[in-house]
Amino acid sequence: MTDHEPFQQEPQNPQDPQDPQVVVFSPELLKLADRRRQALEDIRQAAEDGDANAVVQMGMNCLYGIGGAAKDPGKAFRWFSQTAPDDPAGLYWLGVCYDNGFGVERDENRACRLYQESAAGDYAPALCNLGVCYESGQGVEKNLEKAVELYRRAAEGGYPMGRCNLGVMYFFGQGVEKDLKKAAYCFAQAAEQRLPRAQYLLGVCCEFGDGVEQDVSRALALYREAAGAGYPDAQCALGVLHHQGKGVDQDDREAVRLFRQAAEGGYPRAWHFLGLSYDQGTGVEQNAQEAFRCFLAAAQGDYTEAICQTGMCYYFGHGAEKDYDRAAEYFRRGAEREHPRAMTRLGVCYETGHGVEQDVQRAEGLYRRAMALGELEGQYCLAGLLRRRKDPESHREAARLLQKPAAVGMPRAQYLLGVCYETGDGVEKKPRYAAYMYHRAALQGHPEAMLRLGICYETGVGTEKDPAIAANLYRRAAEQGSDLARCRLGRLYEQGLGVERDLRRAEELYEAGTRAGVSGAKEALDRVRAALAAPPEPQPEDKPVDKKSPLRRLLDRLKGPKSEG
């Protein structure tokens, strides 16, 4: 969509009453309305007499509902159609109508031709919109260098949107060598002319130090000015600063208000952030269904991150009914836009056959594409896929792939890498390093890592033997649903290792394991019940114990793996 803001708007009178009841009874307003009607009649009469400027002004009045005229795009188009063939302003506005479908069927090719005719007279707004045509390939062959030339000519004519668009080209290095300082300069020129988009973009430069010295306070002021003018991108950026507490006091409620304001203004990214707020319960009551609705609205606005997030909601049934087919379709849309997480999730669909026909080779290709874009989740999934193959080389590659995700703190990768080092799968067997990896994953709450680390402490493999720490780890893993951890904990209660012997507690844990189908749980349950039915045995003398808590001893030992030669 090209720029179509009116270049002449009647300034709002700050004395105009806003209350409709006051409007009815205010003599001052009635006088003002009379003056506007008379002014409109004067312009209409001049237009009918062939005054080119009056014709354009009447069209603008009808297009935007200003100057006392009712908003009527059809009438606006008819007025613009009466402009002279050599009037640049009239040709430009007629192009705007065709470009946006104002009062006429949309025709981008005809709009481009009209911009070309208007630009021949060096009319700055037409030069700018023609630049947009060349930048996007709308009505002409795409040519970024030509777009830059046209934006530059519009900027030299003092047109703020031309300056702003030229800045964008410098910012991204499109059609011209990338130059953040020149980009910021262009934005600053247009911002001085109070163009909200330029104020926002200059704010971005100030927030992140792109082309100017980083200055969050200045960014905040620019965002506020643009947001006050109703620019949704700035409202959203201001919301992010409030959410982060960056330059302002952290205030999630204010962030949500700004996200909602920007979303209602049609900004897809704001819908996405509003969805995250509902999903996480920040600044608003947590509501998965409302989060999904926001993600869907952002996805319908073609915001790529939300396209992937909507797929996740369908895949896991989070806020929406689980639907693998729809999930795969959204992941496909995201992958087509080179979104690495969407590629990974589409790969998972192909690997599992969820929503698509199973195709492991295609899954591998998607994981590798995502990994090439720096997606660690894709790298982890590729490692998991390779581990399921039979050949040793695949297992060696899997172990190599797990190193980076584990190093940056991904608990699943740390756990799986620990399994590799514990079993010697794809790497040299190193029990101590395996225990270290389990430690790191367990500290982040990974239940399988807690279980494996508990076994290390129970058996003394890879670390010092400490049944009390083992019991604590089994308990934490069991609380997260690990049935095997329940049975391992039951064994410690049965034998009185690391905990006080308690056959009733052991019975409860073995019973839960039996219901879950854990191998050996039924035999252990029968054994404990037999022991409970037998006469009580004499209790052994108490042994001295380490008075430190199991968790404290666990943390004391988390100092990295010792050398294993």
Predicted feature residues:
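Hydrophobic face of amphipathic alpha-helices that form TPR/SEL1-like repeat modules
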Residues: 57-64, 69, 91-100, 114, ...
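TPR/TPR-like (Sel1-like) alpha-helical repeat modules
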Residues: 370, 501-519, 526
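Canonical positions in the second alpha-helix
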Residues: 46, 82-83, 117-118, 153-154, ...
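Short helix-capping/linker turns of helical repeat alpha-solenoids
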Residues: 48-51, 64-66, 85-88, 100-102, ...
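Canonical tetratricopeptide repeat
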Residues: 55, 91, 105, 127, ...
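Terminal, low-structured helical/coil segments at or just beyond the last alpha-helical repeat
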Residues: 7, 520-565
